[in-house]
Amino acid sequence: MIKLLLALFTIFTLVHAQPSSKALNSSLEAIGIEESYEEIRALDGIRDKYATSYKSHMKRYKATQEDHATIAKKFEEANVPLFFSLIPYCESNFRSDIRGHGTAGLWQFMAQSGRTYGLTIKKGNDERTDICRSTDAAILYIKDLKKEFGSWYLADFAYGMGEIKLKRLIKKNGSNKISVLLKDPAFPRGTKDHFGKTLLLDATIHQSKSEE
């Protein structure tokens, strides 16, 4: 009974806790961002802004930890920050069966992108909905974006908005610093939301592990 109560308390704390600035800075550093959370004005108030969706993602994370551990191991073995293993919670609510406008699976691959990274996509066999195969493809794609843009956080931005749009933003601003890019009105809201939510999730999970 005591163990059950402790487990329930841990789940409640993880779902309702908000990450500290220290935890957020650790997550930012892990994806190559040299500026601190406090210095990035565009991130002001994200804990309150995304409070509702953040709690929903945390509940989903607790319900899918076993499956997440499987893909997290793949990211670790590929030397890709674990931040990226949390993208599916914001992309698809960690559901492999979900479909969007031409997209499908945990990683919401378009058919063309999926095929480029080795996925079979045909009637009766769409590997975008296969957790392991689609994750392998996502890792290859993210690593290619890292090679192209030189940093992990830019790889995340490119994943969200596309390579061409990110290149235009960098050229327009004459900088690839996150504090500069995020304050540009042309920075896609969807990509900014995706980044903020994933950052909160990553920071909270690492904070909870450090407190164990």
Regions found by a protein language model. Give the residues of each.
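Catalytic and binding regions of secreted/periplasmic enzymes and modules that target cell-wall glycans
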Residues: I142-N173
